[in-house]
A protein has these predicted regions:
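A helix-boundary/hinge signal
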Residues: 1-192
């Protein structure tokens, strides 16, 4: 804390030291990231957001990393066996993951990335929530598969994600809705 003071005066705030100014000074200037609102959307389930945050930081223990540390015999993706298990592969290129994301996008009638960037407010929240749920369930299934050596069909996982997204939309939805959102929500109700 010594560098916050010069000649007995508090540098960060001309009014002097306060708990708030001290806390802000200790935090420092953190660069903002473009994906913050995508991961930490208040409609998302917190444990899903946490996994999303780990994914964005590439901090999950993937087989590629474990293989380099000689903790596993291969680095092959356990879900599709088509490439090394990296963050990019598991959540973007893996055929198993792509199936889940595609089925969710078909149900929601919107590409998740497009909905997050360009959708109505309701669609942005719902797409962020669906994205985090997909990533969470993919990671959960990957871990179950490593332990139990059996893989659940993507349709079963999609059913769970759809139920969760549908329930949470109904919890957070605020009336009145835009006409486009009314039609969209009715479509989700019909297909859930």
């Amino acid at each position: 804390m010594a560098t916050g003071y010069v000649n007995s005066s508090w540098l960060p705030d001309a009014k002097g030291y306060s708990i708030r100014s001290g806390y802000c000074w200790l935090q420092g200037m953190n660069p903002s990231v473009s994906w913050y609102s995508e991961v930490w959307d208040n409609w998302c389930v917190p444990k899903h957001s946490f996994i999303g945050w780990l994914i964005k930081h590439e901090a999950l223990n993937m087989k590629e990393k474990l293989h380099k540390l000689h903790l596993t015999d291969n680095d092959c993706c356990i879900l599709c066996a088509a490439g090394p298990e990296t963050h990019m592969h598991l959540f973007k290129s893996c055929s198993y993951s792509k199936q889940i994301l595609s089925m969710i996008e078909d149900w929601m009638q919107i590409k998740l990335e497009h909905g997050i960037q360009h959708g109505t407010e309701l669609q942005r929240h719902a797409c962020r929530m669906a994205q985090m749920a997909c990533w969470y369930y993919i990671w959960l299934e990957r871990n179950k598969c490593r332990i139990e050596l059996k893989l659940m069909k993507p349709a079963c996982i999609v059913k769970d994600i759809r139920r969760l997204v549908h329930t949470r939309i109904n919890q957070f939805i605020r009336l009145p809705l835009l006409n486009v959102d009314k039609t969209w929500v009715q479509h989700l109700d019909i297909l859930c």
